Amino acid sequence: NEDRNDIAYVLGRLFSVLESIQKEANPTITTTIHDRYFNSACATPAVIFPVLLKLKNSHMKKLERDKGGAKVYYEKEVGKIMGKFDDFPKRLSLEQQGQFALGYYHQQQEKYKKGEDK
């Protein structure tokens, strides 16, 4: 739901897009950021999201080299989502972690509807 602005939900959506970028840049990858960072990202976003955004930059360089259109698309998606908040919260409550997961899975469903993921 792109109209929801609560931070935990929006961060879940952002995490999903970052994972999609990773998968698009590295189609044969077996361990994704979801496997490695999901639990930490939904509990302590201020610590984990800077790491994820650095990884995104590496993946975007690869996309720019191999799939320029995908890079532009994902930059717009990340920009739209990040425009909904000013800071990464240090911690999310258990209820907020549930909203993070909901945002993640809603964004995943949107991706499948659009046929972006294999």
Task: Outline where the language-model segments fall.
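Intrinsic-disorder/low-complexity detector
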Residues: 1-118
